[in-house]
């Protein structure tokens, strides 16, 4: 089973003027200057910090991950002063495992930069490149055997179908971490099971 705990409240935001204020997520520092349709809004690096207690988990059987669903545009994530990961791209989910770094109380720091750079596309657009953490941040607790979380932030499941009159061929590819088999079920609109498949890990 997977448990999810949101980290949306009790953040400290240090903006371009160096002043630190309390904020909740989602948050952007361009909420005002990015509204007039011009290209004169402020772009640069700001910092978000929060503290959280370690979740209840079994380190022998489970892992803990941080999940960011949207940080625009580049991010550097630190946990307890140690760099955890970096990410370029403001519109995609990214995750990092933190099991071995957790303390009883933890400080999470996210350095966010929406400056113009050559790593994040699009380079130009007719909309504002809002800087900030504008989607959910979560703690995930999963079993060590789980659908992969670290594959470019995707779901770890790819479904393709070949529809024919009166039938459908459905192929499900699942990226997994750990050992064991994967069971896939197909339900109809009423929640009744109409198909089931099982496969072993191949690599």
Regions found by a protein language model. Give the residues of each.
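Short clusters of hydrophobic/aromatic residues that line enzyme substrate/ligand-binding pockets
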Residues: 20-23, 147, 157-159
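Short capping micro-motif at the N-terminus of alpha-helices
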Residues: 23, 86-87, 196-197
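Structural beta-strand segments of beta-rich domains
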Residues: 62-64, 166-172
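Beta-strand-rich structural segments
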Residues: 172-173, 185
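Intrinsically disordered, low-complexity Pro/Gly/Ser/Thr-rich segments with frequent PxxP/GP/PP motifs
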Residues: 193-203
């Amino acid at each position: 089973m997977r448990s999810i705990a949101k980290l949306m409240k009790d953040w400290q935001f240090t903006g371009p003027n160096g002043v630190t204020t309390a904020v909740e997520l989602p948050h952007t520092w361009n909420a005002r200057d990015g509204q007039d349709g011009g290209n004169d809004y402020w772009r640069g690096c700001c910092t978000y910090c929060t503290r959280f207690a370690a979740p209840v988990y079994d380190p022998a059987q489970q892992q803990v991950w941080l999940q960011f669903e949207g940080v625009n545009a580049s991010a550097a994530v630190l946990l307890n002063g140690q760099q955890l990961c970096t990410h370029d791209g403001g519109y995609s989910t990214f995750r990092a495992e933190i099991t071995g770094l957790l303390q009883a109380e933890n400080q999470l720091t996210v350095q966010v930069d929406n400056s113009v750079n050559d790593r994040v596309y699009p380079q130009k657009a007719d909309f504002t490149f809002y800087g900030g953490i504008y989607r959910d941040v979560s703690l995930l607790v999963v079993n060590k055997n789980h659908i992969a979380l670290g594959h470019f932030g995707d779901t770890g499941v790819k479904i393709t179908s070949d529809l024919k009159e009166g039938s459908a061929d459905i192929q499900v590819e699942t990226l997994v971490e750990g050992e064991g088999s994967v069971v896939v079920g197909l339900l109809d609109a009423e929640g009744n099971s109409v198909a089931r498949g099982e496969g072993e890990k191949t690599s």
